[in-house]
Swiss-Prot record:
Function: Receptor for the chemotactic and inflammatory peptide anaphylatoxin C5a. The ligand interacts with at least two sites on the receptor: a high-affinity site on the extracellular N-terminus, and a second site in the transmembrane region which activates downstream signaling events. Receptor activation stimulates chemotaxis, granule enzyme release, intracellular calcium release and superoxide anion production.
GO cellular component: apical part of cell; basolateral plasma membrane; cytoplasmic vesicle; plasma membrane
Chief location: membrane
Protein's recorded name: C5a anaphylatoxin chemotactic receptor 1
MF GO annotations: complement component C5a receptor activity; G protein-coupled receptor activity
Topology of the protein relative to the lipid bilayer: Multi-pass membrane protein
Length: 350
C-alpha cells in the first residue's frame, strides 16, 4: 500500500484511507515490519483467540433462548456481528505480514473488506440499541410491559443491520485493486477519482452515525440509569458504576483513534507530514478498534457475579444468567421501587 493515498478509513490495511493516486510518491519499502504493524499483529492475534471463542460461546448460549427472552435477541445479534468481524482477522493479518500486499483478487477486494466493515458497524449500532433498551426498561417500565416484545426487538436489530449496510456501500462501490512494481505487490483500496467532497462526506457521515451518535446514546442512557439506580438504593454499590464505566469507556477508548485518524486524513493533503504519520499508524488504529469486538464477552462475565461465584459456576451457565435474564416486566404487573432498581442493576452488562 505504499503508493496509495489514504482517504476515508475502512477496516484493514487495504482500507478506505487508501486511494489510487498514481502521482503520489512511492515510499521506500523495507522487509522489516514497522513497530505499529508488529503491535497490530499482536493485538489481532489476541482479539482473534478471545473474540472467536468468547463470541461463539455467547452465540451458543443465546441461540437456545431467543424464543423466550428478548435479551437473548440483542446479545445474539451483537455476538454474531462481533464473531464474524473476528473471523475476518486472518485477512488483515495476512495483509500486514505481506507489507499490505493483497493476494485475494479483485472481487475479494470489494467483498471481504466491505463485509468486515458491515459487521463492525453492526456491532456498534447494536450496542447503542441495547443501551436504549436498558434505558426504556428503567424509565418506561409500563410501556415495556405493554409493547416490548420479540417482534419489536427483531425489527430494531434489522434497522441496525440495515444502517450498517448503508455505511458500508461506499466501500463496496469505490474499492479497486492496483498493481505496483516497486516493490511488486497488489494493493486494495478505494478510489474516489479525486472527488474530495465525496470522500469527506463519507468520512463525516461515518463519524456521526458510526461513532458520535452511538457514543452519545451509550453515555446518556447509562448516565441516567446510573443516577436512577444510585438515587433509589440505600447502600450504593460501586458494581453498577464499574459496569457503566467499562461499557462507555471501552467503546470510546478503542474506537476514538480510528475515527479521529480517519476524519483527519480525509481533510489532509496526502503529501503533508501529518498525513504520512497517520498513515503509518493506521494498522494500530484498526487493531484498537477491533478490541471492542472481543471485550463484550469479558464484560458479560465480569458483570455476572463475584469472582468466587464464577469459580463455582460453569461459564456457559454464568453467561446464560447474564445474557438471557429478562426484566421484571414479565414477572410483575406493577413496578415498585425495588424491582426497578434490581432490573437496572442486572441489565447493565452490554
Amino acid at each position: 500500500m505504499d503508493s496509495f493515498n489514504y482517504t476515508t478509513p475502512d477496516y484493514g490495511h487495504y482500507d478506505d484511507k487508501d486511494t489510487l493516486d498514481p502521482n503520489t510518491p512511492v515510499d521506500k519499502t523495507s522487509n522489516t515490519l514497522r513497530v505499529p504493524d508488529i503491535l497490530a499483529l499482536v493485538i489481532f492475534a489476541v482479539v482473534f483467540l478471545v473474540g472467536v471463542l468468547g463470541n461463539a460461546l455467547v452465540v451458543w448460549v443465546t441461540a437456545f433462548e431467543v424464543k423466550r427472552t428478548i435479551n437473548a435477541i440483542w446479545f445474539l445479534n451483537l455476538a454474531v456481528a462481533d464473531f464474524l468481524s473476528c473471523l475476518a482477522l486472518p485477512i488483515l493479518f495476512t495483509s500486514i505480514v505481506q507489507h499490505h500486499h493483497w493476494p485475494f483478487g479483485g472481487a475479494a477486494c470489494r467483498i471481504l473488506p466491505s463485509l468486515i466493515l458491515l459487521n463492525m458497524y453492526a456491532s456498534i449500532l447494536l450496542l447503542a440499541t441495547i443501551s436504549a433498551d436498558r434505558f426504556l426498561l428503567v424509565f418506561k417500565p409500563i410501556w415495556c410491559q405493554n409493547f416490548r416484545g420479540a417482534g419489536l426487538a427483531w425489527i430494531a436489530c434489522a434497522v441496525a443491520w440495515g444502517l450498517a449496510l448503508l455505511l458500508t456501500i461506499p466501500s463496496f462501490l469505490y474499492r479497486v485493486v492496483r498493481e505496483e512494481y516497486f516493490p511488486p505487490k497488489v494493493l486494495c483500496g478505494v478510489d474516489y477519482s479525486h472527488d474530495k467532497q465525496r470522500e469527506r462526506a463519507v468520512a463525516v457521515v461515518r463519524l456521526v452515525l458510526g461513532f458520535l451518535w452511538p457514543l452519545l446514546t451509550l453515555t446518556i442512557c447509562y448516565t441516567f440509569i446510573l443516577l436512577r439506580t444510585w438515587s433509589r438504593r440505600a447502600t450504593r454499590s460501586t458494581k453498577t458504576l464499574k459496569v457503566v464505566v467499562a461499557v462507555v469507556a471501552s467503546f470510546f477508548i478503542f474506537w476514538l483513534p480510528y475515527q479521529v485518524t480517519g476524519i483527519m486524513m480525509s481533510f489532509l493533503e496526502p503529501s503533508s507530514p501529518t498525513f504520512l504519520l497517520l498513515k503509518k499508524l493506521d494498522s494500530l488504529c484498526v487493531s484498537f478498534a477491533y478490541i471492542n469486538c472481543c471485550i463484550n464477552p469479558i464484560i458479560y462475565v465480569v458483570a455476572g457475579q463475584g469472582f468466587q461465584g464464577r469459580l463455582r459456576k460453569s461459564l456457559p451457565s454464568l453467561l446464560r444468567n447474564v445474557l438471557t435474564e429478562e426484566s421484571v416486566v414479565r414477572e410483575s404487573k406493577s413496578f415498585t421501587r425495588s424491582t426497578v432498581d434490581t432490573m437496572a442493576e442486572k441489565t447493565q452488562a452490554v
